From Swiss-Prot:
Coiled-coil regions, chain positions: none
Broad class of where this protein is predominantly found: membrane
Protein's name according to its UniProt entry: Uncharacterized membrane protein YrhP
GO cellular component, one term: plasma membrane
Subcellular location: Cell membrane
Disulfide bridge map: none
Entry-linked InterPro entries: Homoserine/Threonine_efflux (IPR004778), LeuE-type (IPR001123)
Keywords assigned by UniProt, alphabetized: Cell membrane, Membrane, Transmembrane, Transmembrane helix
Species of provenance: Bacillus subtilis (strain 168)
Length: 210
């Protein structure tokens, strides 16, 4: 119980500190609406669940110790973040009149496509993030009692991390959607898109070099 209470604030800090997930949730919520943001969060939770299963099977340690596997995941993740960053940097203003009309028409005809894209971005950004592997290999074991059921404890710790992430990003989606009416200035949107792109590329480069 004591170790669990010590783990919760650490997990909360890992979630709250801005990263690639934060930028993706902000971008998709602003561009496609709160529902797309929630699908992004669902993808994020799916990615974390994927690594939970991997950890339970003992494969996270294998991946962390395998230079080839870990490096492959690292570079794939870096390339994916850079791709998303470049795409965001060169994207049109989210709220230009033509873009809004075109987007409204496209979403009305095939909304699932946008939600699927948001979901996949959330999933892949976590599945291809080597730092997620390290959380399961280096941080969580510090709060596991080796005399107890290790898998059960791992599931509890991972569930807490996932729950905190979902709650935090749902709150972020709500705030962004509420503030959207003050963020429709085209100049603001252009600056935001480019800053988002630069930050994502920066995260990608940092991931590749770490």
């Amino acid at each position: 119980m004591h170790s669990l209470l010590a783990y919760i604030p650490i997990a909360a800090m890992m979630v709250i500190i801005p990263g690639a997930d934060t930028m993706l949730v902000m971008k998709n919520t602003l561009r496609y609406g709160p529902k797309a943001g929630r699908y992004n969060i669902l993808g994020l939770a799916t990615g974390l669940s994927f690594w939970t299963v991997i950890a339970i099977l003992g494969l996270s340690v294998v991946i962390a110790k395998s230079v080839i596997l870990f490096t492959t995941i690292k570079y794939l993740g870096a390339a994916y973040l850079i791709y998303l960053g470049v795409k965001s940097f060169f994207a049109k203003s989210m709220f230009s009149l033509d873009d809004m009309q075109s987007q409204a028409k496209n979403m009305a005809s095939s909304p699932k496509r946008y939600y699927k894209t948001s979901f996949m971005q959330g999933s892949l950004s976590n599945i291809l993030n080597p730092k997620t592997v390290l959380v399961y290999v280096t941080i969580m074991p510090q709060f596991i009692n080796l005399n107890g059921n290790i898998n059960q404890q791992l599931i509890i710790l991972a569930s807490i991390l996932t729950l905190l992430a979902v709650l935090w990003f749902l709150f972020l989606v709500y705030i962004i959607d509420y503030a959207k009416k003050w963020m429709k200035n085209s100049k603001f949107q252009k600056v935001f898109q480019k800053i988002t792109g630069i930050i994502l590329v920066g995260f990608g480069i940092k991931t590749g070099l770490s």
